[in-house]
Structures are given as structure tokens and as C-alpha cells.
């Protein structure tokens, strides 16, 4: 366990450091940040025949953290004092995911094929809280001769954010086939249907903290489910063993959520389409790729306003396009 030290404080008015040793702590030596991560992962492969096999997998991840700190909010070089906020927070996230697919290699006439079909599922459970961040110390600390008192966070929270949560479940079903028409020309295509169910929101600490419009029980700012069929298509043509051109088209579907910010209307999933075309050169010494891309998204969420007036809105479409160049090589042995 290491003491959590944020270091010295930057004076925002002058963009300079206070005239004290940089090693001097203005928070508290008992600041604490701890985290624990557990991971379980296993895969099974079963050969059905010479050209077919069955794959299955499961993974579990858990992440827990806790922090307790005195956070510097202001340094007054004239009075030689620093003001700090005493905060405490903990969180727990668990992710279960599993997959099952079948892979087959076969020929249709002179065309070799690699076929994949499967299903995957994921459950993500994230709980944050309790969060105590309402306590400012009554007395400031002297920056020249600090007296560390090991303060404890006051167990109160009056803004309705003491507990935050996001529960997400997804299921995907997919098929994909890669066809080798010749040694030089390869095409791949696939379909994927993805479904999600999501609940996210917040509530306050207890009845005494709940103000008008705040919730003591779990009520979601986001409570939704949806699904969509997605397409993917790609092609590669090799002019020589070292030079190839390629083109790819794909679609995306991503659920969005709001924990603390009210949502204006329905928070629809973000959807995207991307297209890329380019050329690639590769030999034993280096490889280079030049590509043009175009990415468009719709149902993009954006926070409008601030503080108590903040609201999450769907702002419409976004588009990005450009040129990408990548070069990798081995300079020496």
C-alpha cells in the first residue's frame, strides 16, 4: 500500500508553482487509493472433422477500488494557506462474457471458403458509491509549516450522486464467409445482429440527503433496449506478392447512457458507417499502408449546458474523412 500523493499544486492565476519545496505535501500522508483486479479466462476448441471445429470461451473480470483523500482546491500565497476537500469513493465493476462459434473450411467448385458462425453475450455490472464529496475542512493548512491531522471524509452527499450505476447486457449473433476466388483475389462478407438491454442512473445517499426531484431508490436516466442488423464487406486484390489493394465497409451500433445528466427525449444508440480504400506494400524489411477513409455517425449524444442546467441531447450526424499513412520497418539487425 503506497500513500497517494498528488504532488504540489499549480497556481491557476499565474500558472506557476507556489514557492515551497516540491516535495512538501499539501494534502495528507494518509491519502489512500487501492484497487483489486480479478480475471478468469478459458477457451475450449473441439475438432469436429478435418475442416470443421467448434470454439467456446468464457471470461470474468472484476475491478474494485477505493480512495480516500484530501484534495487541494485552492492555495493562497498571501495568507500562506491551502484549502482542501475531503473525499471518499468506492466502486465495483463485474463483467461476464461468453462466446460460441463454429469454423469451417470447404470448397465450392474452385473457390475455397472459410466460414464462421457464432453467438456472443456480455453482462457488465458497474456500481459506484457511496460517494462522499461534500466536506471542506473548517481550517486551512499552512503551506510553510503544515500540520497533518489525518481527517476523515464526512459521510454526507447532498447532490443526488451518492450512488451511480450502469447495467448493460448484450447479445450478438453473426455469420461471416471469406471466399478465395484466386490466389490474388479475396472477398469477405458478414452479417451481425446485436441486441442490448441497459439501465443506468443514480440516487442519493439517504432520505435526509434527497432534495426535491432526487431519488432515494434506483431510477434510471437511461432505461432502454434495442437491436440492429449490421453489415460488413471487404475485398483484397494482390498485384504481386508484395503489393495489394483493399477496400472495406462496416457498420457499428453502440448503446449510449446517462448516469447523472437528464436526457432530452430518447437516448438512441449511436450508429456509424465506415468505408476505407487503400494500398499496402510489404516485404521482409518493412511495410507501408496508404488509405482513404470516410466515417459517418448519427444519434451522437452531446451535453448541452452546465451544472443543474446540463442536459444530454442527440445532436444529429457527424462525419470524418481523411488520409492515413503507416510505415513500419526494421532499421538494423
Regions found by a protein language model. Give the residues of each.
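Extracellular loop and loop/strand-boundary signature of outer-membrane beta-barrel proteins
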Residues: 25-30, 39, 43, 83-89, ...
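Membrane-embedded beta-barrel scaffold of Gram-negative outer-membrane proteins
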Residues: 43-59, 63-69, 238, 245-246, ...
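Signature of Gram-negative outer-membrane beta-barrel scaffolds
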Residues: 64, 112, 116-240, 262
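Solvent-exposed loop/turn elements at secondary-structure boundaries
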Residues: 10-21, 89, 94-105, 114-116, ...
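Surface-exposed extracellular loop regions of Gram-negative outer-membrane beta-barrel proteins
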Residues: 37-43, 51-105, 168-203, 228-254, ...
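Residues that define the transmembrane beta-barrel architecture of outer-membrane proteins
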Residues: 34-38, 92-96, 167-171, 225-229, ...
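Acidic/polar loop-and-plug regions of large Gram-negative outer-membrane beta-barrel proteins
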Residues: 1-47, 60-93, 136-166, 170
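Outer-membrane beta-barrel translocator domains and adjoining extracellular loop/strand segments
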Residues: 2-17, 36, 67-73, 128-134, ...
